[in-house]
A protein has these predicted regions:
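Amphipathic alpha-helical packing segments from all-alpha helical-bundle domains
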Residues: 67, 71, 106-132, 142-146
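Amphipathic alpha-helical linker/stalk segments
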Residues: 22, 56-83, 122
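Short alpha-helical scaffolding segments that buttress acidic/His motifs in well-ordered protein cores
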Residues: 84, 98-102, 148, 152, ...
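Hydrophobic alpha-helical connector segments
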Residues: 68-96, 141-148
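Amphipathic alpha-helical segments used for helix-helix packing
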Residues: 89-109, 158-165
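C-terminal peripheral helix-coil segments that are non-catalytic and often amphipathic
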Residues: 86, 90, 120, 124-132, ...
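Helix-turn-helix
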Residues: 11, 15, 19-53, 57
Length: 196
């Protein structure tokens, strides 16, 4: 059973997600978050200590949830990319939070301090798949990972061309998933063949 403190924390995180996704870190207001969550500002501060720590908690919640919802496997890069596409549709706030963090805090370099080991495990899996001939060995594992994530986010909220929404027709989503899988297969998988 969820405790009252856990429910309170989640109400604050949900309201903060909406505020930060819409307005960024600098534009977000603690009073709006408190009002939207139905909590007082002192309650918000007692749980998170301030706006910056609250953003960090919101960001971590969405990034970690994405990793939990879409477990990585180097055995099926095309399928992983398609599952990421679906997850970005299900959690449009994720891409917006990533964008705001990149714009307002970490303009360059690694965006996920504290999660280095998480990504290092993915890079080891990619390197092992390269060694076994399933992923192109002429690319650095870091580059494979970056290209995979960026390609999967082609239609996410940070797209510079077209943003996909859950309201788009199912046939359009199917077409995009197929194109994404083909592009990843041809560009990252050894011999352009389906892995797995």
């Amino acid at each position: 059973m969820t405790s009252t403190a856990d429910r309170t924390r989640q109400l604050i995180l949900d309201a903060a997600t909406e505020e930060f996704a819409a307005r960024g870190i600098a534009g977000a207001r603690v009073d709006r978050i408190a009002q939207a969550s139905g909590m007082s500002k002192p309650m918000l501060y007692s749980h998170f200590g301030g706006k910056d720590r609250l953003f960090d908690a919101v960001f971590a919640e969405h990034v970690i949830a994405n990793g939990d919802r879409v477990p990585f496997t180097a055995d099926d890069l095309p399928g992983y990319a398609a599952r990421l596409y679906d997850d970005y549709l299900a959690d449009p706030a994720l891409a917006r939070l990533v964008m705001w963090k990149r714009l307002e805090r970490d303009g360059t370099g690694y965006l996920y301090p504290g999660l280095e080991e998480h990504d290092a495990a993915h890079l080891r899996d990619i390197a092992a798949a390269q060694a076994s001939g399933r992923i192109r060995a002429d690319l650095n594992p870091d580059d494979v990972w970056t290209l995979l994530i960026a390609t999967a986010a082609s239609w996410a909220q940070v797209s510079i061309t077209t943003v996909a929404t859950r309201d788009d027709p199912a046939a359009l989503h199917a077409r995009r998933r197929a194109a994404l899988e083909e592009h990843v297969r041809d560009g990252l998988c050894a011999g352009g063949a389906t892995t797995g």
